[in-house]
Structure formats: structure tokens, C-alpha cells
Amino acid sequence: TVIRKSYDDNITSSDVNARDFFDDRFYLNPTTSHDSLRVMRLENKVFIRLQPWKSDGIISKLDVGLGDKLLNYFAFEPDSYISGGSNKVFNSVYLYAGAQGQYDKYLQWNAKGQYTFLGHEINDFGIEANVSFSAYPFRRHRTSPLTLNAHFETTLKEPDYYQQHMLTNHYRWDNDFGKISTTRLEASVSV
């Protein structure tokens, strides 16, 4: 996947509205902007899927695999004045696993996890789990379930390159953030 974004403008020194829009921040050129960002992501996976029992069993599928993620970022940097624009390339290798199953029409579940053991995003991980319980309490509509859904997710991830570094005509930062931890628990009921 390749994502490109280009931005051009010409703002005169007397254009008060346009200058106020950017809080009068012009880091590279006071009247003209031409900013370009590009991200390329290439991901390869090798996995094996096991179906230990029947397809609608309590454990119906097990997945185990190995993945390789290549990220290529292009952005302007102060060194670009001397050497021209350059790409920043990061590679990471990870293990992932998942499982899913169900019990009749009353229970469905799935879970997956990923751990990066080599490369730029070393020690990143993510765990995600979903469960759905269904009951059929309605006498007149015996096939209409009352369903409780729950979702749990936790991640620890390296910030991406643009969260850490940015130099455009109107925005500039150079940070050294640590890993970002996110935990989410959601539940819903449907009738």
C-alpha cells in the first residue's frame, strides 16, 4: 500500500486570513508551501491454520504465523537542503496467533495476538478478544436472540515516524516518544 499526500499554497504577506489559519507559522518559506509526504507499507505473512475439530466446535480454528512488515516513509528534513529528500525505511518481524470457536447458537468467541520480536518495532504487542453470548427468552419470537457482546483489546506500540518527526512549512516537531499503551473494554446488548 502506498499513500501520497501533496500540499501547495501561495500565501501573500498581506493575506491575513490565510496567515491566521496557520497561526502565522512559516518554517521554510514565508509565502509559498509545497509539502509532500509518502508512506509505503509492504507486509508478508506465512501462516498455518488448523481445524482440530469440526468447524462449529468450541475450538474450531487455530492460526499461527510469522509476518514481516516493511515501512518506507518520505518526508522533508533539514538535511534535505544539502542531500535532497530521503526515505526512512523500517523493518519488523513478528509472530501472531489466533483461535476461534462457538458452542451451538449460544456462544461465539475469537482471540488473536501479535508480538514483534525483531526490528524497529521490537517488543510491540497486541491482544484482542471477542465473545458473544446469546439467549432466546422470547416466547413469541423463539428465533430472536438477546445477545451480549464483549470486546477486549490491549496494545503496546512504537509511535509511527510521523508521530515522532515532522517538518513542513506550517508544522514542525521532533519528538522521542516511548511506546504507546492502549487498553479498551467494550460491551453491548442487542435485542
Q: In which residue ranges do the predicted regions lie?
A:
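Exposed, low-structure sequence patches enriched in small/polar residues
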Residues: 1-16, 24-25, 29-191
